[in-house]
Curated annotation (Swiss-Prot):
The lineage of its organism: Bacteria, Pseudomonadati, Pseudomonadota, Gammaproteobacteria, Enterobacterales. InterPro entries: CobQ/CobB/MinD/ParA_Nub-bd_dom, P-loop_NTPase. This is Protein TraL. Gene3D superfamilies: P-loop containing nucleotide triphosphate hydrolases. It comes from Escherichia coli. Keywords: Conjugation, Plasmid. The keyword Phosphoprotein does not apply. SUPFAM superfamilies: P-loop containing nucleoside triphosphate hydrolases. To plasmid R751 TraL. It comes from the Bacteria. NCBIfam families: PRK13886.1. Pfam families: CbiA (PF01656).
């Protein structure tokens, strides 16, 4: 049985591709060879990670899902023994969610012996309410066969609204039973950890590539090592990974 990790969120620029890359690297760190697929019709950021051998597959035709291309995606997933990591774009969020639900894809994957794990991201700052709403939409609409992992990304500010943390918000408390794990991306000090991590993401480098790059200072690599450990330890604790 393989786990199909799908990153879904209707807001653009909130770290979806970075999360897909972290999941794929975590799998590789465990000796697995995940099948990585980028379906973002606008920004193929995930595909930019050459070390992850990401396959590009455009599943959109205008504003609609191209059902033939989606069929190709299912055919790729069906026989796999390896876990799959799929990055999806913000522009395909609504049609893809609708297509997955109306065609009962989560149940189909379960019949194949696979498990659908939806990773969604909630971010601080201006996009907080949009991303919280995106999570609530997914959790309330997807059937029980789909599992959920919520990533909290504080890059643009703390994840709190009217004094409430994410775990205290109605969107979470109403859907708590659907959430298997919450992954907290650390709030990184901007001039050190934050800059190092940002630079690595901009360059589409994996942690392994960055740590092997002798042009980076020893302390930069040390900080990246600490960030990786913090993320991977949380993924170790997430039962659905």
């Amino acid at each position: 049985m393989a786990k199909i990790h799908m990153v879904l969120q209707g807001k653009g620029g909130v770290g979806k591709s970075a999360i897909a890359a972290i999941i794929a690297q975590y799998k590789m760190d465990k000796g697995q060879t995940p099948l990585c697929i980028d379906t973002d019709p606008v920004n193929a950021t995930f595909e930019g990670y050459k070390a992850l051998n990401v396959r590009r597959l455009n599943i959109m035709a205008g504003d609609e899902i191209n059902s033939r291309n989606f069929d190709t995606l299912v055919e790729l997933i069906a026989p796999t023994k390896d876990d799959v990591v799929i990055d999806n774009g913000a522009s395909s969020f609504v049609p893809l969610s609708h297509y997955l639900i109306s065609n009962q894809v989560p149940a189909l994957l379960q019949e194949m012996g696979h498990e659908l794990v939806i990773h969604t991201v909630v971010t601080g700052g201006q996009a907080l309410l949009d991303t919280v709403s995106g999570f609530a939409q997914l959790a309330s609409q997807f059937p029980a066969e789909a599992l959920f992992v919520v990533w909290l990304n504080p890059y643009w500010g703390p994840i709190e609204h009217e004094g409430k943390s994410f775990e205290q918000m109605k969107a979470y408390t109403a859907n708590k039973a659907r959430v298997s794990s919450i992954i907290q991306i650390p709030a990184l000090k901007e001039e050190t950890y934050g800059r190092d991590f940002s630079d690595m993401l901009q360059e589409r480098l994996t942690f392994d590539q960055a740590l092997a790059d002798e042009s980076l200072t020893i302390m930069t690599r040390q900080r990246l090592k600490i960030v990786r450990r913090g993320l991977f330890e949380q993924l170790d604790a997430a039962a659905v990974l």
